[in-house]
């Protein structure tokens, strides 16, 4: 698996992009901003505070699995969940991982779900893993599809205390035909791209925040800002 160094970010990014298979196309899609029509709610099993204003889609959110956030006591997630959507939908936003909590591994920052993710459906976890002292960003998809495992997708080295833009585009279709594309940017330069072949139900929802994966450990704090949701046609 090609791991990209931020020192050669532009050249290496092209190599990673060429290694990505495309499950479907998002060309010529017209996107409409949802604004207050898709406000986030607290994940029922998490400990994030529900936003209280209609401008929450553009606010800055802090998520943490830390000793001082009361999210390590039997909680493995601190996330916001957006409403279900069918067809074309898109999430854009910027995340920054707090370098004060650097001793972590296997933490998710964004996800796409339908309600039966353990068996079928869109199930993508955009995550950061610590490998040999480096922080690696990548994705794993629905485990029913062998080409959607973590090691089968491009990965890129990222830095803590650095603001990255993540754009996730999904087309929720029936009969196992759904698909998703995602891109990661640093200073408006695309450094990573991947596609998920997911199948499953057409109604899905996006999540952002801090999520401890199986085998994950350590304290983790991430900030999201300028989060926007779109529908497409």
Swiss-Prot record:
Superkingdom per UniProt: Bacteria
Primary location group: secreted
Catalytic activity: Eliminative cleavage of alginate to give oligosaccharides with 4-deoxy-alpha-L-erythro-hex-4-enuronosyl groups at their non-reducing ends and beta-D-mannuronate at their reducing end
Leader sequence segment: 1-23
EC number, as in UniProt: 4.2.2.3
UniProt GO MF annotations: poly(beta-D-mannuronate) lyase activity
Protein's cellular compartments: Secreted
One GO CC term on file: extracellular region
Keywords: Lyase, Secreted, Signal
Record family assignment: Belongs to the polysaccharide lyase 7 family.
Protein name: Alginate lyase
Organism: Pseudomonas alginovora
């Amino acid at each position: 698996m090609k791991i990209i160094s931020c020192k050669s970010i532009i050249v290496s990014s092209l190599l990673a992009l060429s290694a990505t298979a495309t499950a479907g196309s998002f060309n010529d899609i017209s996107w409409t901003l949802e604004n207050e029509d898709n406000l986030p709610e607290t994940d029922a099993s998490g400990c994030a505070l529900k936003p209280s204003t209609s401008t929450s889609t553009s606010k800055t959110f802090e998520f943490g699995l830390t000793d001082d956030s009361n999210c390590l006591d039997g909680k493995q997630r601190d996330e916001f969940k957006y409403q279900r959507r069918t067809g074309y939908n898109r999430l854009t936003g910027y995340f920054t991982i707090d370098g004060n909590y650097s001793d972590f591994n296997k933490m998710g920052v964004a996800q796409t779900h339908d309600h039966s993710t353990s068996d079928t459906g869109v199930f993508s976890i955009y995550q950061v893993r610590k490998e040999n002292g480096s922080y690696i960003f990548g994705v794993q998809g629905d485990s029913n599809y062998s080409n959607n495992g973590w090691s089968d997708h491009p990965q890129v080295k990222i830095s803590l205390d650095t603001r990255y833009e993540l754009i996730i585009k999904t087309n929720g279709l029936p009969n196992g035909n759904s698909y998703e594309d995602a891109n990661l940017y640093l200073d408006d330069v695309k450094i990573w791209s991947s596609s998920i072949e997911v199948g499953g139900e057409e109604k899905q929802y996006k999540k952002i925040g801090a999520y401890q994966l199986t085998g994950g450990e350590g304290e983790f704090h991430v900030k999201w800002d300028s989060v926007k949701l779109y529908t497409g046609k």
